[in-house]
Amino acid sequence: MIIHPNFDPVAIHLGPLAVRWYGLMYLVGFIAAIVVGRIRLKLPHVAAQGWTAKDIDDMMFYGVLGTVLGGRLGYVLFYKADFYFSHPLDVFKVWEGGMSFHGGFLGVTLAMVLFAWQRKRHWLQVTDFVAPMVPAGLAAGRLGNFINGELWGRVTDPNAPWAMLFPGAMRDDAAWLSKHPALVEKWHLADVFMQYQMLPRHPSQLYEIALEGIALFFVLFFFSRKPRPLGAVSALFLIGYGLARFTVEFAREPDDFLGLLALGLSMGQWLSLPMILAGIALLVWGYRRRPVNAAA
């Protein structure tokens, strides 16, 4: 078993200002997205559409607003609506954590629609250009989750090579023991807990880096190197992310205040299903519509 390093959540201190790893990873993610975007400017079919480095910089401004506002509101509405309706001022306490990818996705989509309207472009042309830039940011964000030792995975066999002990999960681990007696006996978890006061879990943040970040990046980057029908790159992102997130959720610990929902699926899985379906519909629409020269 591997013990999570339990990093200090503060990366650096600048006088009275504490720069946290999670915020730093957001910055790294946006910078990585800009780098990917500038690489894409060199593709002939992208350059032919008149994209410039300034467009990317302006787009990132919209993207930051969409990510932060949408991510926070999505968490409030999708995950803890009852709490925040009772404590509305707590919505603004972003330093206490609480961001939703699906909310951030909706926020960024709306931001890109606004950007497209201002630049008099088709909004799908904008999202097709942006889609390959997103996985780099997702990977950085999940790395921030791992450094913080949060959003850990479900309990697993202590003999599994991926088994990891998360100090931040101690309280959850103690409660888990009484709820799953069969697995406690099967995996001899009582002995493990006696020794470490923790239970072995999937490092699901690393799975998400691998699937939602690295794998999805390469799929989108190489798919978009050639001209594609309008909406095709965006559709592949929806399908790819939705499938990756849906899969990883089987290894990720559900939010304790929600648990598993209908059909034994998590909130993340239920929110990913519409993405997959929308992606399939958009892909079919794009290829039926053609023309390839409209692609990003």
From Swiss-Prot:
It is an enzyme of class 2 (transferase). A 1,2-diacyl-sn-glycero-3-phospho-(1'-sn-glycerol) binds at R142. It is a multi-pass membrane protein. Its EC number is 2.5.1.145. Signal peptide: none annotated. Pathway: Protein modification; lipoprotein biosynthesis (diacylglyceryl transfer). GO terms for biological process: lipoprotein biosynthetic process. This is Phosphatidylglycerol--prolipoprotein diacylglyceryl transferase. It comes from Burkholderia ambifaria (strain MC40-6). The gene is lgt.
